[in-house]
């Protein structure tokens, strides 16, 4: 049926013509992505040692070495993306309901119809097993585990964190890590730099973001963000038999022990708890609700093209409905992280490398770790002591202490899905706030006391909205490290991947609006990006070549 302009809709364009326009716009967006991306090479680190490959839940021998035939079956699953083939991958422990279910190895075979294709973005290879950089990454995760119960505000004086800062700074590979906070003199300040990142605002003020400790209101219900956190001084998988059972996909011994007091997030164990119990995007929704309550989006419905006009307000575009839809849409970045995890890198989790390190130190394996880790006496003696204190008969192990019984999820480590998601969410929030408002000071900042029972006013330097959004993203990414299940490169590269994907998704959407508008905000690394409706974009005022954003490094004046 063909409709004329006399159709009942008050629309100067007949419905069939509008359908054609929508189709043409979608095709043009897809062509722009295809032509703007070009050929993207996906490169892993070339590692052939199975010790550095993901194989959790597969059968292992008594030394935790994966069965070669089972590993080949996993490779076949990944290559084919077929549910029936993946169902035939052997499991090491098949008692009862399989705990070690592989987490969505077929996800990357889906096709997205918005934003870039999964394979149209990439991340750098991870360091190889013998490298000083991997040694430093693993050492940082160990130090995070040792410091789980130190209040963040005591990082500058507590023995563990002061020692951790000095020890990490002295490792050859540490200054080369992604977004690592380190002084020009090569030292790490334990209070402002330890376990932080160089992203805008993350090194300023309290460790924990305001968006994780401020109350939020949803549907007129105000929620104080105290949680039932993990019990202090309790770690898991420090006994070798327990570790091996989990590597085989066996069931944990029981649930985690919990604290009997509700607390604000005041230390690494609390932050680990948040990132273990979250529903992957809830921190972003909480953050958005807090920012709305603070009029950080100027005020609800008055943003973007509606800021300087009086008779109209946004809702579906540049209003509450739009804000929360964009946060939900940013979840699509997760699929790109799954592509990188399964199809490209398949890197082992920290708990697996911790087992290999333990067996190497014990002389039962001969893994080629860098000496900066193998001979790190200060770190290893502390790991031995904390593990022996919890093990039967005070058995000394060098396994990585986990905050949870089950250890890592059953999918590869690199990049972190939580980080990719939160890189996307942070990008959406900063785009909606805008550059000017993003640089304003966050009002009445606070931090939890050392017991996590009350909030104390922070009297230091200005904490900006954009900085606290960035800090939220880094907190969530590094909270997964504090669980013991990720490395720094998982978090940082995941955040940057989520940012890149979301910039492109926002730009696609911007070009469809009837309202004249732009998005202008600061990227994690400090550059100001501005997106225009004609498809162009600038970095720090320089008009970038190309059709789509592929990273700051590809747009230099």
Curated annotation (Swiss-Prot):
Active site per database record: 411, 418
Record keywords: Disulfide bond, Metal-binding, Oxidoreductase, Peroxidase, Pyrrolidone carboxylic acid, Vanadium
Region annotation (Disordered) ranges: 1-22
Residues with Pyrrolidone carboxylic acid modification: 1
Catalysed reactions, as listed in the record: RH + Br(-) + H2O2 = RBr + 2 H2O
Residues that hold vanadate according to the record: 341, 349, 416-418, 480, 486
Enzyme Commission code(s) on record: 1.11.1.18
Domain of life: Eukaryota
Cofactor annotation comment: Binds 1 vanadate ion per subunit.
Disulfide bond residue pairs: 77-86, 441-462, 544-555
Assigned protein family: Belongs to the vanadium-dependent haloperoxidase family.
Subunit structure: Homodimer; disulfide-linked.
Protein name (database record): Vanadium-dependent bromoperoxidase
Record organism: Ascophyllum nodosum (Knotted wrack)
